Amino acid sequence: MGALLQSGNVTPGHLVTWVTDGVVQDGGATPAAQRVLASLRGANFNITTDQPILIPLNFVAFQLTSIIVTNASISLTTAVGGFYPAGSKGGTPVVSAAQSYSALTTPAGLLAVTLASFGANTRFSSTNLGAIGGQLAIWFALTTAQGVNAVADIYLIGTDLT
């Protein structure tokens, strides 16, 4: 492959492929990559009520690959709880209600929670997730609260399948 001798239009965000020496063409869309799909900043780890994580409207279907919790305000020695596809701890858990957050001892700590089988092996969409005002959501709800004021940030990581 040498210098570019002829070029066509390549759609922004698409790959470029060589057709022959000096000629390129549109190579199609970039393969889906993992990224932050949604987040809940300052999630309260001292309550056991629902805390919905709203999925942006542009994600109609996605694969959840991990949930990361970080930036804990204090050492989360007591907090235990999971993630659910519906409010009031409804539906098959995405993350078990027994998930501990005790590994988070400093704001710099990072915990990739353990996805349950449903969380790791499901194509999420409106067929299996609840919604708030037409927006898909995954609910975070503790089984056991920390006992004192505590917050942390939660990030849903996945692949857009829209």
What are these regions (language model features)?
Residues 73-125:
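Terminal beta-strand-rich extracellular "head" domains
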